[in-house]
Design a protein with these regions (language model features):
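Solvent-exposed loop/turn segments connecting transmembrane beta-strands
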Residues: 50-58, 80-89, 99, 113-124, ...
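Transmembrane beta-strands of outer-membrane beta-barrel proteins
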Residues: 42-46, 76-78, 106-110, 141-145, ...
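Short glycine/proline- and aromatic-enriched beta-strand/turn motifs that initiate or cap beta-hairpins
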Residues: 31-79, 89
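Cleavable N-terminal export/targeting peptides
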Residues: 1-36, 168
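Residues on the lipid-exposed face of transmembrane beta-strands in outer-membrane beta-barrel proteins
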Residues: 43, 63-67, 77, 91-96, ...
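Outer membrane beta-barrel
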Residues: 105-114, 119-121, 128, 133-145
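Repeated loop/turn-to-beta-strand initiation elements of outer-membrane beta-barrel proteins
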Residues: 39, 71-75, 101-103, 136-142, ...
């Protein structure tokens, strides 16, 4: 079924809906007032694909937000250009209960869209193993994206993040 509006408008609306959902969740989940030191601005991704011969885009520019609820949980949402050179949006929650030195280990669970071979570009759920390093104003999320047959190509993805106030 084709929508009577341009695809960019639909994707833009999706991101607005995702952002609104994240903000509502942040508001409802907050035990205290907003703490700027818990807010990260995330860049897109650099993805080292396991199928390097498929002509996939490794540089995935984008912009997202991540808000740490506590030492183990954080919420995230954003938009980027995916490996198929399409616009994608995401929304999710990190759960990282394990520490290995300076690394936090766990998973991010959530939903993505924009992959033409996965659910016709629509939203789909994902559970992805992650590691995070954070120090002062800078951090790095590393995700092991599993392949999904011929629908989604696997990769080791790196996401830089920045916060204006260090803390937590």
């Amino acid at each position: 079924m084709k929508l009577p509006v341009p695809p960019d408008l639909v994707l833009g609306s999706s991101l607005k809906a995702v952002s609104l959902a994240l903000l509502c969740t942040l508001g409802g989940a907050a035990k205290a007032e907003f703490d700027a030191s818990r807010l990260w601005v995330n860049a897109g991704f650099y993805s080292a694909h396991f199928d390097a011969d498929k002509g996939l885009r490794n540089a995935n520019p984008g912009l997202g937000l991540e808000y740490a609820l506590d030492e183990r949980w954080s919420l995230t949402a954003g938009r980027f250009i995916n490996s198929n050179d399409r616009n994608s949006s995401y929304v999710g929650a990190y759960y990282q209960p394990w520490q290995l030195g300076p690394l936090k280990l766990g998973v991010v669970g959530g939903a993505f869209n924009g992959y033409p071979n996965a659910f016709n570009g629509g939203w789909f759920p994902a559970l992805i193993p992650t590691a995070t390093y954070e120090s002062g104003h800078w951090g790095l999320n590393v995700a092991l994206v599993p392949p999904l047959k011929d629908r989604l190509y696997g990769a080791l993805s790196f996401q830089l993040k920045f916060r204006f106030q260090s803390g937590l």
